[in-house]
Design a protein with these regions (language model features):
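C-terminal cap of thioredoxin/glutaredoxin-like
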Residues: 10, 20, 147-214
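Soluble non-cytosolic domains of exported or imported proteins
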Residues: 8-12, 16-24, 68, 79-82, ...
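Structural alpha/beta surface segment adjacent to cysteine/selenocysteine redox centers
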Residues: 71-150, 155, 160, 182
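Short, mixed-charge aromatic SLiMs
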Residues: 1, 22, 40, 136-145
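Short N-terminal helix-initiation segments at or just after the protein's N-terminus
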Residues: 11-14, 43-50, 128-136
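Extracytoplasmic thiol/disulfide redox context detector
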Residues: 18-109, 164, 168-180, 186
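FKBP-type peptidyl-prolyl cis-trans isomerase
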Residues: 1-9, 29
Length: 214
């Protein structure tokens, strides 16, 4: 018996057709199950009490009287956090009159940048340090931090004392541990009205979520 050669692409075309057919059948089955079970699809899950973080040291700006909160658990030394800060800045510019925006430190351990922001907060300069560090093109080292503190005309003796305060370190370390206990695992983590946002960090999707909450 002689073998009959198949034309090139015949098997690939058949497999492709079978895959498309399988996908259609599966999608039809899923749609049918959704309709019968009346399942609702969420972009993020219903409220989870364990993800409430407002009792921790959260810094706020925007509309402080708003019932809609947008909290970010973030790390100054995290590349993804630095990138997300650009999106967050756009959201803040768009919704600052309607939303209460919050920030809470979250990392493996308290960083120099985080400690500096908390020390600056003692003199009312948390957000200026926060923005400057995220906008800095390199890792914020002690030289950058002290030079920026001087440029803001802080009391340098007081700033230095608070920067190296054991209580300052313990406070941030405790916050990090509490966040881990509440289920946070990565940075940046977004929390809108006590709900974790798992799926997206895009400006468009986050805008839609905020519009739904307002």
């Amino acid at each position: 018996n002689s073998l009959i050669p198949l034309k090139k692409g015949t098997i690939e075309e058949e497999l492709s057709f079978q895959q498309r057919l399988r996908n259609r059948i599966v999608q039809a089955l899923v749609d049918s199950l959704y309709q019968k079970a009346d399942i609702k699809r969420y972009i993020y899950p219903p409220k989870q009490p364990e993800c409430v973080v407002r009792d921790l040291c959260v810094h706020y700006r925007g509309n402080l009287d708003s019932s809609t909160s947008f909290i970010v658990a973030s790390d100054y030394n995290c590349g993804r956090c630095v990138q997300f800060e650009k999106t967050l800045s756009k959201l803040y510019d768009q919704y600052r009159e309607q939303v209460k925006f919050g920030f809470v430190h979250f990392a493996d351990a308290p960083s120099l940048a985080a400690l500096a922001c908390e020390a600056a907060d003692k003199q009312g300069q948390f957000w200026s340090f926060h923005d400057a560090i995220f906008n800095y093109v390199e890792v914020a080292d002690s030289a950058f931090i002290y030079n920026f503190a001087k440029s803001k005309r802080l009391d340098m003796r007081e700033f230095d004392k608070n920067l190296h305060s054991p209580d300052n370190y313990k406070k941030l370390d405790n916050i990090i541990n509490r966040l881990v206990e509440r289920g946070l695992m990565a940075t940046p983590t977004i929390i809108i009205n006590d709900r974790l946002v798992y799926v997206t960090n895009s400006y468009e999707e986050l805008s839609k979520l905020l519009e739904r909450e307002l």
